[in-house]
C-alpha cells in the first residue's frame, strides 16, 4: 500500500474512532444502564471501517475507541481487568467483522439485496456477539454482586448485557443494510 493510501486509511480510522466515541456519549445520555452499557449505534463507524479496510483497520478502530473512552473518563470501571474486557477487548472485537468485508463489498457492488443483507447481518452479528461475550465475562466476574438474590451470576450477566446489546445489534444491522443499499460507494476504499 502506498503512502497516500495509508494516510487515507489512518485518517478514516481517526474519524471513525471519533464518531464512535461521540455516538456512544450521546446515546449514553438517553439510554444508559445502571452498571454501564447503553443502546447505541456506536458500533456503526467500527463496522464501516472494517468493511472498507478489513480486519486490521477494524480492530485498530475498536481498540482506539476503547482507549479514547478510557482517556476521557466515559466509563464504568471497577477493576483494571474489567476495564480491559469492557473497553479494549469488547470494542476491538467488533473489528473482527472485517472478515466479511469482501462479501459485503461484492454484494453491494452487484446490488444483490439478499446477499448484502445476509453478509451485513452476519458481520454485525459476529462483531456484536464478540463484544457481548466480553461484556458477559466482565459482568459475571466483576458485577456479580448486583445480581438479585438467588439469580446465578452468569444468568444475570447474560440477561443484563443482552438488554442493550440485542437492540444495538438490531439497530446497527438495519442502519448498515439501509446505508449500503442506498450508498454502496461507502464501502469502496483505495484497497478495494
Swiss-Prot record:
Gene Ontology annotations for the cellular component aspect, listed alphabetically: plasma membrane
Sequence intervals crossing the membrane: 10-30, 31-51, 57-77, 81-101, 123-143, 164-184
Annotated Pfam families: Thia_YuaJ
Compartment(s) of residence: Cell membrane
GO molecular function: thiamine transmembrane transporter activity
Observed effect of gene inactivation: Cells display deregulation of thiamine biosynthesis and impaired export of thiamine products from the cell.
Disulfide bonds: none
Record membrane topology: Multi-pass membrane protein
Major subcellular site: membrane
Keyword Ion transport annotated: no
Keywords: Cell membrane, Membrane, Transmembrane, Transmembrane helix, Transport
Ion transport found in the keyword field: no
Origin: domain of life: Bacteria
Family: Belongs to the vitamin uptake transporter (VUT/ECF) (TC 2.A.88) family. Thiamine transporter subfamily.
Main function: Probably a thiamine-binding protein that interacts with the energy-coupling factor (ECF) ABC-transporter complex. Unlike classic ABC transporters this ECF transporter provides the energy necessary to transport a number of different substrates. The substrates themselves are bound by transmembrane, not extracytoplasmic soluble proteins.
Quaternary structure annotation from Swiss-Prot or TrEMBL: Forms a stable energy-coupling factor (ECF) transporter complex composed of a membrane-embedded substrate-binding protein (S component), two ATP-binding proteins (A components) and a transmembrane protein (T component).
UniProt protein name: Thiamine transporter ThiT
Organism: Bacillus subtilis (strain 168)
Gene: thiT
Amino acid at each position: 500500500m502506498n503512502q497516500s493510501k495509508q494516510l487515507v486509511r489512518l485518517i478514516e480510522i481517526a474519524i471513525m474512532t471519533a464518531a464512535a466515541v461521540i455516538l456512544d456519549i450521546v446515546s449514553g445520555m438517553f439510554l444508559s444502564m445502571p452498571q454501564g452499557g447503553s443502546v447505541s449505534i456506536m458500533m456503526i463507524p467500527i463496522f464501516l471501517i472494517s468493511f472498507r479496510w478489513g480486519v486490521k483497520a477494524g480492530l485498530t478502530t475498536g481498540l482506539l475507541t476503547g482507549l479514547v473512552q478510557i482517556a476521557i473518563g466515559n466509563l464504568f470501571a471497577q477493576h483494571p481487568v474489567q476495564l480491559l474486557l469492557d473497553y479494549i477487548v469488547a470494542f476491538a472485537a467488533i473489528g473482527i467483522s472485517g472478515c466479511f468485508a469482501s462479501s459485503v463489498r461484492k454484494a453491494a457492488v452487484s446490488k444483490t439485496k439478499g446477499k448484502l443483507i445476509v453478509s451485513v447481518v452476519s458481520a454485525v452479528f459476529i462483531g456484536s456477539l464478540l463484544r457481548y461475550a466480553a461484556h458477559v465475562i466482565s459482568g459475571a466476574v466483576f458485577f456479580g454482586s448486583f445480581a438479585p438474590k438467588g439469580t446465578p451470576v452468569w444468568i444475570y450477566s447474560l440477561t443484563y448485557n443482552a438488554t442493550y446489546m440485542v437492540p444495538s445489534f438490531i439497530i446497527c444491522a438495519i442502519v448498515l443494510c439501509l446505508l449500503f443499499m442506498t450508498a454502496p460507494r461507502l464501502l469502496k476504499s483505495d484497497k478495494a
